[in-house]
């Protein structure tokens, strides 16, 4: 009885995973708070961590790795985010406080394996300016 039940559950699990994961899936991502090519101000009095928000479309269930490249070329690994469900804002937190950031060009790199689909890598370039508040 148990081997038959186990075989059925195993076969069902394989069927469901193959039905859900699309090997031809192309995962797209879009910046919500920082859009590629635009300039933004950062509050230099804030000691909050830098965050960025992305949405994904057409992705298999997986995670995306986020990296922030500083103007001097240093790379910071930010928290990973889920790539599903579609059109859901996902926030990544980076290990730098806003009051530690300098004015300059930053890159936000978003990459992932896309489950069993096509891997992806996107780059969002943005210029951040320190906003001095007194």
Task: Give residue ranges: language-model regions.
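Extended low-complexity, serine/threonine- and proline-enriched intrinsically disordered segments
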Residues: 61-77
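Short edge beta-strand/loop segments characteristic of extracellular beta-sandwich folds
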Residues: 49-57
